[in-house]
Amino acid sequence: MTTFKSFLLLLCISFSLQAYAQEKVTAREVLSLDKGWSFHKGDIPYPVIKGHNATYRNAKAGCVSGAASPNYDDSSWRIVDIPHDWAIEGRVNPDANLSQGYYDRGFGWYRRKFKLSPEDKGKHLELQFDGIATHATIWVNGTVLHRNWCGYTSMYIDITPYATYGDDVNTIAVRVDADAQEGWWYEGAGIYRHTWLVKRSPLHIITDGVFAHPVKKTESQWEIPVEVSLYNSGKLTADGEVEVTLLAPDGQPIATKNQKLSVKALREGIANLPITVTKPLFWSPENPVLYKVKTQVKQNGTVTDEVETKCGFRTIRFDNNTGFWLNGENIKIKGVCSHQDHAGVGVAVPDALWEFRLRKLKEMGVNAYRVAHNPVAKEFMAACDSMGIMVLDENRLFNTSPEYVRQLEWQVRRDRNCPSVILWSVFNEEPMQGTENGVEMVRRMYDVVKKMDPTRPITAAMNGGFFSEYNVSQAVD
């Protein structure tokens, strides 16, 4: 009998390992979730929970009550598409905040339902919000998964453990607190940038996970020290191969590098694949030449994930006496400082409008743009790259606590491949700029940025404190 039980145990283990070894291997899908959100303007109070059984249940994952619950009746809510700014839909209120354009903001709720095919089971599923104004709490299928503390940063939320498949419906609920103000300008209200659902194989490239910024080595030789960050959401160690190919502006391959690696379950792995390039074409405002780095993950000869990252070859240098140098040429920076909102749409700016605005600025002779005073939409950054607008990329919140360091890291990771970015700015006009506390904060933010991108100078937009014994100019480039 003991021998028979041992045989059954080994048989079960064998079947189990076979099931784990056959993990889903598929190509990446990026699906827009912009259409068909249910929207309620105003807050909906959480229900008062009384009694032991109700209180016990309410404390459990997936059992939230009220408007965040999958079972909540939202049939009377209005249907809207994203990007959406509910503040600009209202009327000007003379009693509202001047700095917010005399528009009321307040609270709002969004809900959206979607189904997943049984074929999606085993994939890594990521919910992405490009921007919500301002603070937000996000639930999926009754479990709170994310709290957002900045209206200008993106959210990448792993919903894999919470997803349901087939006929079961998945429910996203978002409570937006737009009374939380971060700036002294019109900030809008709501889910005002795009939303996405990204499906990937268990072994995949993480979002913003390719660093491919060219570095000049000699007069004619350049190197792209490509760094690829991967994650394995599967149940077993995953073996794979990372391949990067540099594509010329006309799409022709220039160079390819490969690296095999093994990533344990629920761990990250990094592949480093430096590519050498001779005499590339330079990126500039007059001729914004863009190359592409195509990154593929292969398993058993099959491409399981792929992303293309645009990059540009250019050198930058600032000199105390002569000013700014781009590609060895002394040029004048003719820039503007502008916020993201636009007449009629508020902060829910259509993608085509970014290019329209930049085109008008170029017609005026502008070659540079300071984002005021926060990370902008990724579509705007892509337009600056392709249209030849140099960017001073500025952080929103001056704070070195863990949450705000995470926001700064996100910004650098997303934008560090952009040839348009010539400077990082860690703050704008902060009262602590002429104090020892301010210096210590900037020192730490400077270190965060330099570790992630050693190629660009770091500044801060001071408007005072220049002659204080301690001032932040001592801690930046």
Set out the residue ranges of the language-model regions:
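Extended carbohydrate-recognition surfaces in non-catalytic/accessory domains of CAZymes
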Residues: 22-128, 182, 188-191, 203
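N-terminal carbohydrate-binding accessory modules
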Residues: 24-28, 209-211, 294-363
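Bacterial Sec-dependent N-terminal signal peptides
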Residues: 1-24
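Signal that preferentially marks extracellular ectodomain short beta-strand elements
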Residues: 157-163, 272-288
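Accessory beta-strand-rich segments of carbohydrate-active enzymes
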Residues: 40-44, 100, 104-208, 233-234, ...
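Beta-strand-rich binding/interaction modules
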Residues: 140, 221-262, 269-273, 293-295
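Short acidic/polar inter-strand loop motif in beta-rich domains
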Residues: 44-46, 177-183, 282, 298-304, ...
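Substrate-binding/catalytic cleft of secreted carbohydrate-active enzymes
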Residues: 358-360, 368-477
